Amino acid sequence: MIQRNIRQLVQYGLQTGLITEADKIYTTNRLLELFRLDELEECSEEVSMSVDELEAVLAQMMDYAYAQGIMTENSIVYRDLFDTKIMSMLVPRPSEVISEFETRYEKSPMEATDYFYKLSQDTDYIRRYRIKKDQKWVAATKYGNLDITINLSKPEKDPKAIAAAKTAKQSGYPKCLLCMENEGYAGRVNHPARQNHRVIPVVINGSRWGFQYSPYVYYNEHCIVFNSQHIPMKIEHDTFCKLFDFVKQFPHYFVGSNADLPIVGGSILSHDHFQGGHYEFAMARAQVERTFTVKGFEDVEAGIVNWPMSVIRISAADSGRLVALADVILSAWRGYSDEAAFIFAETDGEPHNTITPIARKRGEKFELDLVLRNNITTEEHPLGVYHPHANLHHIKKENIGLIEVMGLAVLPARLKDEMEKLEEAILSGADLRKDELLEKHADWVEEFLPRYPQINKDTLMDIIHTEIGNVFMQVLEDSGVYKRNEEGQAAFDRFIESLNC
């Protein structure tokens, strides 16, 4: 079987364009070496392999490797390390990938990113077969259609691997998952293998950055743009310059940055990076509901967006004017307090106000969304006042970062099983409060069920999905510093007025 698998994988490389006919013998010999084989057996049978067969062929190869003692452990962590090593035999060198990207970029930026995105999938850096497992649906709300996904593509670590990670030697190389040094890295039990990972160098605002795709692809062409230096996230004047520099180079992509403070920031604050992609989020589709003008920037369109979070949208043909106005708004917000609205710029010397910025090109104009954030905590809300409140934690407890802000819920994998069990329990009339797993959902279910007269096997999961969408809408409303009521919007207007003082 391993002989056939090797032939299949080489054929896969040829079919996807990862290797050429000139690479065929070389690649075959590298795979023979990996599996400790001395020769390729004679075979008259023609082999072929589709993209859909990759998962199964790699699984067979790993089963063989484990049986032969080539792979010492057989859990998901070790299998991921080894199948990445297998795929590395097919992946072009970084210089070849960069050269091909640059050649295509001369024709069009979109052709270049199309090539790189396909490559990132063909190399199995983006595991198509795992991404397919994610549960996705669209939830209609008063703010438009929100995207909901239950993330199932990140494998759960088994107890043995978790224990091994605890006792493994702690390494500072690479410093984090976003560092340049990940390219080609073999990985270890507490750090993923990246031999099949490639990075495109880009110059952003005069400094060296890298461009890659997220292996988890939460939306179409989900890319990460990261500083070549391991330096912390910081929202400042240069951030806006960098965002627009990227958009000018890749005008079909949006790009945004997580905020630079805990709670309201992303999961990696230690390494300066942006996220972007070829996708239109619900927030980008949301309309400006009222406009305003900032003195000295009469040439810039500005307004408040109809969105559950507090978003200022500015637009102009000259990106430099947007950078200048964004700088004014950021500076004003950093130092802004409004006790009546429970907005405090700092407490005990700890800063609370920051911004989540998102840049895009729309037609002939550049556009920048500035989402106002505040990370203050209280005894009542120890995880954050402007963070999902406790009554929503049964669905979403994690930080609300850039992706969620724009209208895509990334929900924990536990919800798949919980929602399936919840469906069974509701249909059978079981007492949710007596079920340890489902008890946390009881108040929620009791609140929404009376609204639906037709509850049956055919309708219930759709109802649950709709209500998860409503919870996510509330999550975003909780995270908004200015609430979507008369009092909250009056407070928002006070901040806008302060820009002209």
Segments (PLM) and residue ranges:
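Catalytic or ion-translocation cores adjacent to nucleophile or general acid/base/metal-coordination motifs
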Residues: 238, 247-270, 276-337
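Helical scaffold of the NTase/Pol beta-like nucleotidyltransferase catalytic core
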Residues: 196-198, 230-255
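Generic structural signal marking isolated hydrophobic packing positions
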Residues: 227, 273-274
